[in-house]
A protein has these predicted regions:
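Charged, amphipathic alpha-helical linkers/stalks
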Residues: 1-43
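Extended hydrophobic secondary-structure segments that form protein cores and membrane-embedded regions
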Residues: 138-139, 182-185, 277-282, 333-338
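Solvent-exposed flexible segments
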Residues: 263, 274-289
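Outer membrane beta-barrel transmembrane domains
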Residues: 269, 297-415
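Extracellular/periplasm-exposed beta-strand and loop segments of Gram-negative cell-envelope proteins
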Residues: 147, 156-158, 189-202, 230-257, ...
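Outer membrane beta-barrel translocator domains of Type V secretion systems
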Residues: 37-271, 391-415
Length: 415
């Protein structure tokens, strides 16, 4: 154990090697099984499994947790967008289409008026929905996604797959200009490390939240707040080192709070296309501190990690337009892109120790991810009637070191 660098990397340092060196020097009897297995192991095998010995994947899992919580929040955000654009009520796109069809032929023939954009006035054009009295809605969305946290610099990558369902109800007030709603979601995430790191984990999430939309003559203001309970079940093994291959299991829980605020200006072109510059788009998420214990095996770890905080601030653009079908249905395609800068944590860290010698601590860190975050969405809403709507969305997210792509299917009913 003279070469402590054998057990280290750039992200976590050589703390594991120093801890093992101290245990060997002190002849810690409780560590004899681990020290003996490592002493007779091949150096190349030790180098390959150093990240698994440190428990780096537990730190990477914390980044995957933020992706899980963010996926649920994205479902709520997409529902709000679909409702505003004509999903569960006569939204802005439908109003814009009505405005465009009402324009005179002479006005439409002028090049300037064809290209000029004017403000949408939801309050003036939204009387049909109010007159119909349909101001309460129930909705449901199923969602699934696959993502990856890239490996590098001695940290193994982590793949994560998410699936779940979200339910909600909302009501419209103030002549349909204000929407208040609540949401409930349940989701499962399965994770597996790459590059032979021998780690897998399952996370169950239960999420509850509330949201509000406020339309005004020049655009809208949207906000949402959510609480998420997270329950983890992880399994770790040290491959290729005799005596350390038994699976190590840990179960632990923590939670997250998240919030989103978004403002947009609304414009419409002469042909009914609604253009909405988004400024600002602010996302906040905080996952609470956590700790785990893998039992009493020779390589079992105990670990603690502080809270992880994400603060994203940025801007974007979204477009949508409503088309009338041959059978009276309304179809509203949507597109959205948002750029944000991460002002919070871009790396997760644990302070770990072996269960046999918990006072000998070392660091385990995830791979750092980028500060520039790009998200996008392509979706369509089909309204078969004034009461029933169906939504389909493709969503994606990209930053240095992390990607995610997903699909959402939704159903809304207004009464």
């Amino acid at each position: 154990f003279d070469d402590t660098r054998l057990f280290g990397n750039a992200a976590s340092g050589d703390g594991l090697g120093i801890a093992l060196q101290q245990a060997a020097a002190q002849r810690t009897s409780s560590m004899s099984g681990l020290l003996g297995a490592l002493q007779f192991a091949d150096r190349d095998d030790i180098a390959r499994q150093a990240g698994a010995l440190r428990g780096d994947a537990h730190a990477s899992l914390r980044l995957a947790d933020t992706a899980l919580v963010g996926s649920i929040g994205n479902v709520v955000q997409q529902h709000q967008a679909a409702s505003r654009s004509g999903g569960d009520a006569d939204g802005l796109a439908a109003q814009a289409a009505q405005t465009a069809s009402a324009q005179s032929a002479t006005t439409g023939s002028r090049l300037f008026n064809q290209l000029a954009m004017h403000l949408v006035a939801p309050a003036d054009a939204g009387s049909d929905a109010g007159d119909a009295g349909h101001n309460r809605s129930f909705w449901a969305r199923g969602f699934g996604s696959h993502g990856r946290i890239e490996g590098g610099a001695g940290v193994a990558g982590l793949n994560h797959t998410i699936g779940g369902i979200a339910l909600g109800a909302d009501t419209r007030l103030a002549d349909d200009r204000v929407t208040l709603g609540v949401s409930l979601a349940a989701a499962d995430m399965s994770t597996r490390s790459s590059e032979g790191a021998g780690f897998s984990g399952d996370v169950r999430a239960l999420d509850i939240g509330g949201y509000v939309d406020a339309l005004y003559s020049r655009g809208y203001l949207s906000a949402a707040v959510r609480y998420t309970d997270l329950r983890h079940d992880t399994r770790r093994s040290i491959e290729g080192i005799e005596g350390l291959q038994a699976p190590l299991r840990a179960k632990y829980s923590n939670d997250a709070i998240s919030a989103r605020v978004e403002h947009a200006f609304s414009f419409t072109t002469g042909n009914g296309l609604v253009i909405q510059p988004l400024l600002p788009v602010i996302d906040y998420m905080r996952t609470s501190a956590t700790h785990f214990n893998e039992g009493q095996h020779a390589a079992a770890l105990i670990g603690r990690s502080g809270s992880l905080e994400s603060i994203r601030v940025g801007a974007g653009l979204q477009l949508f337009k409503t088309f009338d079908g041959n059978n009276g249905e309304r179809i509203t395609p949507r597109a959205r892109v948002v750029w944000q800068k991460e002002l919070g944590d871009t790396q997760a860290r644990y302070s770990n120790g072996f269960a046999a010698a918990p006072d000998l601590l070392f660091s385990a860190s995830s791979q750092p991810v980028g500060e520039q975050v790009l998200t996008w969405n392509l979706g369509v809403t089909s309204r078969a009637s004034k009461r029933l709507s169906v939504m389909v969305d493709y969503v994606g997210e990209r930053r240095d070191g992390q990607t995610q792509n997903g699909i959402q299917l939704g159903l809304g009913y207004t009464f």
